Amino acid sequence: QPTAAIALDREEISELPHFGDDLYRAINVLPGTSGGDFSARFAVRGGLYDETLVTLDDQELMEPFHLKDFQGIFSIIDPEAIGGVELTPGGFTAKYGDRMTGVLDMVTRSPKATRAGIGISLTTAWANAGGLFSGGKGSWLASARRGYLDFILKAVADDDDDGAPPSPRYWDAFGK
């Protein structure tokens, strides 16, 4: 019998506890998943993190992480761009290929009205906008983020230290 999928809409995702405005860290608290404190990567039902298929609007994402030298500390997915997710922890059909442990299917949101926003969090600054066109027959969405861990590390670095502090910087943009 297939395992029941866990489906979450935008509001439910925002209510999950997570760090750094990271969708993957929110997924990491769902039943059947496990992960580390430092990395955004998660595993499903004891498998390896790369045994889970990740799709965004039916397109497979390979290694969707920033700062891979730091164990993929943040995902490339802006939670502001996501309308919903569905996690299937096992028991899925061959349609999903050779993945063994699970499927994480994400769908981007479709704006219902024109709106824009900017924000700042503990680790990220972001801006997004979305709206309708053609009399409401279509919608558009744009999102950009810039992580600023590099600024934080430079600010707390010891001036007597001979080596330069690590400079973990990242940015991403999304549009549809």
Descriptions of predicted regions:
Residues 112, 126, 148-154:
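Gram-negative outer-membrane beta-barrel proteins
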Residues 96-98, 119, 167:
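A generic structural micro-feature
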Residues 1-3, 97-100, 130, 153-155:
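Short aromatic-enriched loop/helix-cap "lid" or pocket-rim segments at secondary-structure transitions
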Residues 1-93, 103, 107-110, 124, ...:
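Periplasmic N-terminal accessory/gating domains of Gram-negative outer-membrane beta-barrel systems
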Residues 53-55, 84, 103, 115-119, ...:
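Residue-level detector of the transmembrane beta-barrel scaffold of outer-membrane proteins
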Residues 69, 152-159:
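Outer-membrane beta-barrel translocator domains and adjoining extracellular loop/strand segments
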Residues 35, 94-96, 111-115, 133-138:
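Short loop/turn motifs that connect adjacent beta-strands in outer-membrane beta-barrel proteins
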